[in-house]
Amino acid sequence: ADAWTDDAMLGAGFSGAWAELRESYRLPADFIQLVRDFAQQFIQTEKRIEPENVPIQQELDTQTTRLKWIQTSPMDVISVCVDSVLAMPLRARNQDPLVYPDIVIMAENNKAGFEIVKRLGNKGIKVKHTFGHSGDGKDKELSRKQKMSFFIGSEQVKATTIHSFKGWESTCLLVHISKASSATDFAAIYTALTRLKASEYGYDSYLTVVCSAPELAEYGKTWSA
């Protein structure tokens, strides 16, 4: 029940219908090429399904995607995630009402996610999360209940794992990456990137990636090219 993938996704494949992004009605138009670039570089050809078409209505929109890729060290990755969450509302334009409850944190694993939540709490930022009491994965029943109520009436920052966010999407994401060495890792990262959606109200979308995996450093540089 805790698996992030359907049977069709086993082996890092993308044959399941949920991952078919050839017509990208939810991805921001100005982000699609970066997603395609990631897929072409890191996903096996026979497993790859890329977003291709940009709907006409998105082409005409004035909204932009505010992208930030932060390459950092394993020692600093958690603190950089925390600082990035705190800075997110400051990046919004005056006409874009971005507030903390809009932010979704997607952590690579429960342990890292719980540490991010704890440090944000120390700074006065409340977070609704799915990491249980300690992030060690042992209190599965509590974690299950947290997942059931994740988006119900939450006026807080939200945090979960990449694996648990399947089926959801958000206009404001922070993604934590520390591992990028296997096909499964790359599939999970692709999943995380494609959880970003365009705002239906014409506001900007926000995606910050905090990465300590050296394998992605060169790709990350293309976000600011």
Where are these regions (language model features)?
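Conserved helicase motor core of SF1/SF2 NTP-dependent helicases
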Residues: 1-225
